[in-house]
Design a protein with these regions (language model features):
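Sec-dependent signal peptide recognition
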Residues: 2-11
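N-terminal signal peptide c-region/cleavage motif recognized by signal peptidases
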Residues: 14-15, 19
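N-terminal zymogen propeptides
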Residues: 20-55, 310, 403-409, 424, ...
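A short glycine/serine-rich beta->alpha loop
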Residues: 57-68, 109-113
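Predominantly the structural core of cysteine protease catalytic domains
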Residues: 73, 77-81, 108-257, 261, ...
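Acidic helix-start/capping segments at beta-turn-to-alpha-helix junctions
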Residues: 92-111, 143-144
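Surface-exposed, beta-sheet-biased, low-hydrophobicity segments with strongly acidic/polar composition
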Residues: 439-505
Length: 505
């Protein structure tokens, strides 16, 4: 179940998260702002309870058994993001409509293979385009389909549920241990809900006491007694119990443990209903960071009732990792290229050599791209741009066509957006290289005209000139001559009056 590739991912994640501690306030990891969490309460001003267990909250989802090597997303999205979003919205996580799909995130970042990932990668997706609920992206029975969801409304719903940022807490001593417990209890604000935190460790060769009967306020029977030596894994800390007693290797007794939740289901023999006690001692004693990361990861969620600007895209394609998307605008209606152009952070040469919806699935995909973060740069009458880059990335070069490109502008009326449509995109081939599609928010001016007879009975141009009114309201004089019907050529002479005068010589 575990392998050295995942171990490397875990160690790299630990390194990245630890690097974030060198800055006292913020750190950008993978393009997502990370905050070193600081309690709003005065240091030591709170009396913490003896125990906290947020896994018993209605906001925490039922324990589940992860699919494949998806542990990082199972923790960061399936548990942490789900709990925090439901705590924010005061919702019950027992129903699929309120649980967030870790597989939706994992399938976007695993390159079409059963491989591990970083916790922040799923949160980066949550930050940019939101996370689907399990109602829109149901649980899978196999890790090998690598499914992508299709449907504009599903993606539009996902855009409501975002990660604003995520937080780091590093455990190094008793003071930072108190800080973690405070976060779990009420995040430093009296009367507020506590949080949960993701962490990484190894998980091959660990040892447990599965019949713990010592002091406890929370009542679980499983205590970790020895750290693992291989196989990186991600899990979630949901609470603590200060009464737990743990016999250290030197025979001394240490008190207190975190409550950890795993994603191996409720019947995993080393745990108690999917949970185990993780003694504080392991964090504050000397150990290898690959065995257990001292850095814990939390999420600050954001609910967006209505987006501002959303692109709707539909296409058929047979090897999805060939494709990369950009979306942009120009506020100059005479522009021939985007003034502002941004790389879309998902569907970015990802997903492996499969059809758009996954292995053995349909080639068609319809999705939404949230442009709201760039709305402040968008004027009232822009040109909208969609760029599709097609390059061979895997073992085969796919092929396909565009179906839909539309822009939904919710800025004036969130309930009734203005919809701009590309009217002739359906069926256009996605060529190798750069494919640019544009929609003007202003209809081109309409020009009316009357038919004229410009050939005489001999089928030659009439010698006299004609005066036309041009599309800009000015005038031009035109004469036709030297018409060659067989070769399809004609000579045209014209004089344009830029001052609008009809006095044309």
């Amino acid at each position: 179940m575990f392998n050295k590739t995942i171990t490397t991912l875990s160690v790299l994640l630990c390194t990245l998260m630890a690097a974030g501690q060198s800055l006292p306030i913020t750190k950008s990891v993978g393009g997502l702002e990370t905050k070193v969490w600081k309690s709003p309460a005065k240091v030591g001003s709170q009396t913490l309870p003896t125990s906290v267990d947020n896994s018993t909250s209605i906001h925490f989802p039922p324990i589940f058994n992860q699919i494949g090597g998806s542990c990082a997303q199972a923790s960061s999205i399936g548990y942490v993001f789900t709990y925090e979003m439901n705590a924010l919205l005061d919702r019950d996580a027992s129903i699929p409509e309120n649980r967030f799909s870790y597989l939706y995130a994992w399938n976007l970042i695993n390159d079409g293979a059963d491989e591990g990932s970083f916790q922040y990668q799923g949160l980066q997706i949550a930050s940019s385009n939101g996370i689907m609920t399990e109602a829109d992206f149901p649980e899978q029975t196999s890790a090998l389909y690598f499914k992508w969801a299709s449907g504009f409304e599903k993606y539009l719903n996902a855009i409501k549920y975002k990660a604003e940022t995520f937080v780091n807490i590093e455990i190094t001593d008793s003071a930072s241990l108190y800080k973690v417990k405070e976060y779990l209890y009420n995040k430093g604000e009296a009367g507020k809900k506590g949080g949960v935190l993701g962490f990484s460790s190894q998980a091959t060769g660990w040892k447990f006491n599965t019949s713990y009967s010592g002091p406890s306020e929370t009542g679980y029977k499983c205590v970790l007694t020895k750290l693992a030596y291989d196989g990186g894994h991600a899990m979630t800390i949901v609470g603590y119990d200060d009464l737990i007693e743990f016999e250290r290797p030197d025979g001394k007794i240490s008190k207190g443990a975190f409550i950890a939740v795993n994603s191996y289901g409720t019947d995993y023999w080393y745990h108690d209903n999917g949970r185990f006690y993780l003694p504080y001692w392991f964090f504050i004693s000397e150990h290898d960071s690959g065995q257990l990361s001292n850095d814990l990861l939390g999420v600050i969620p954001k609910y967006v009732e209505h987006p501002q600007i959303v692109f709707k895209v539909g296409l058929d394609y047979t090897s999805r990792n060939d494709l990369m998307f950009r979306y942009g605008i120009s506020n100059n209606l005479n522009a021939s290229s985007p003034e502002h152009n941004y790389k879309f952070p998902i569907f970015d040469n990802q997903g492996g050599d499969f059809n758009m919806q996954g292995r053995g699935a349909q080639t068609h995909l319809e999705f939404a791209m949230d442009f709201s973060q760039y709305a402040s740069r968008t004027g009232e009458t822009p040109i909208w741009y969609l760029t599709v880059e097609r390059t061979q990335k895997g073992s085969k070069l796919g092929e396909g066509i565009m179906r839909i490109f539309e822009v939904y502008d919710y800025r004036k009326n969130p309930e009734n957006p203005v919809i701009y449509k590309h009217k002739d995109i359906n069926g256009k081939t996605i060529e190798l290289g750069t494919n640019v599609f544009e929609i003007s928010s202003v209809e081109p001016p309409q020009t009316s005209f009357s038919t004229i007879e410009w050939l005489n009975k001999s089928k030659q141009p009439i010698a006299s000139p004609y005066v036309f009114r041009t599309a800009d309201g000015k005038y031009a004089k035109v004469r036709f001559s030297e018409y060659d019907r067989e070769n399809g050529t004609i000579k045209i002479k014209y004089v344009y009056a830029p001052d609008g005068s009809t006095n044309i010589e």
